[in-house]
Amino acid sequence: MGVYTFVCRSSGDEWTAKQLKGELEASAATPYELQRRLVAAASAADSAAGVQSSFSMVSPSSAVFQVIIGAVGGGAAIGGGAAAGAASGGAAAEAPKAEEKKEEEKEESEDDLGFSLFD
């Protein structure tokens, strides 16, 4: 599995990207085209199956783009334990707790406050 992180910058009409730790580079007219070229470059450097990517704008003229080659499963790989918890069913276990909390909040009424808001 290979992880390729790129720093992307816009200078006028062109977006450029340089790999954070490596020599891969690309440029394009739009961020979308730049992402496509970076995925192609990373895929050429690493022949494993499965590609995930994440593009995050840092400012209007800069972004961070990450390509993960050889990733297993779906969903975002960024987020560390959150993605692993969701893949293992951790999110499903948390859902009933959230529903219980909502039910508890609904049990409170105006009578508990000692006055009515609409009198």
From Swiss-Prot:
The keyword Ribonucleoprotein applies. Keywords: Phosphoprotein, Ribonucleoprotein, Ribosomal protein. Residues 84-95 have a biased composition (Low complexity). GO terms for molecular function: structural constituent of ribosome. It holds the Pfam family Ribosomal_60s. It comes from the Eukaryota. Phosphorylated. InterPro entries: Ribosomal_P1/P2, RPP3. One of its GO terms (biological process) is translational elongation. GO terms for cellular component: ribonucleoprotein complex; ribosome. Residues 81-119 are annotated as: Disordered. Belongs to the eukaryotic ribosomal protein P1/P2 family. Plays an important role in the elongation step of protein synthesis. PANTHER family: 60S ACIDIC RIBOSOMAL PROTEIN P3-1-RELATED (PTHR47207), LARGE RIBOSOMAL SUBUNIT PROTEIN P3Y-RELATED (PTHR47207:SF2). This is Large ribosomal subunit protein P3. It comes from Oryza sativa subsp. japonica. The lineage of its organism: Eukaryota, Viridiplantae, Streptophyta, Embryophyta, Tracheophyta.
